[in-house]
Regions:
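Long, contiguous binding/interaction regions
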Residues: 1-104, 110-133
């Protein structure tokens, strides 16, 4: 695993998944949904861009955190309202496939600050979704 100044074990405990560490110490988590995802009738692996992604970029004692939440329609309003109430910037809401089941929608969200406090906020968002974490 590449090096990062972030405590990956502490972040993993909060997020509930094992991270990868990429270039410049960016720590990334992929959090799959509980329900199987089908694309064109074929069950696909969550790592094929159908998992919520959480990335922490170290910035000294702070981090920039970007989350790409994967949601079904019934989860959108509650998740976005929660994250906005905690000061997250909602970058967009979109869908990328037309033939997946269940139909997924995505929302990029961003905030900078203490990485572990932000991880706790992300956890609150993840808890609103039907995820496997």
């Amino acid at each position: 695993m590449k090096k990062t100044p972030l405590d990956t074990k502490r972040l993993a405990k909060i997020i509930g998944q094992t991270p990868t560490v990429g270039s410049e110490g960016v720590v990334t988590f992929e959090v799959p949904r509980k329900d199987p995802i089908r694309l064109g009738g074929t069950r696909i692996n969550p790592s094929l861009n159908v998992a919520t992604t959480v990335a922490f970029e170290p910035l000294g004692s702070r981090s920039a955190v970007v989350v790409d939440f994967g949601m079904v329609s019934a989860e959108i309003q509650g998740l976005i309202a929660l994250m906005r109430s905690m000061g997250w910037q909602v970058g967009c809401l979109y869908n990328q496939e037309t033939d997946e089941y269940p139909q997924l929608y995505w929302s990029y969200q961003f905030k900078a600050g203490d990485p572990y406090a932000l991880a706790q906020q992300v956890r609150k968002g993840l808890d609103r979704l039907d995820l496997d974490a």
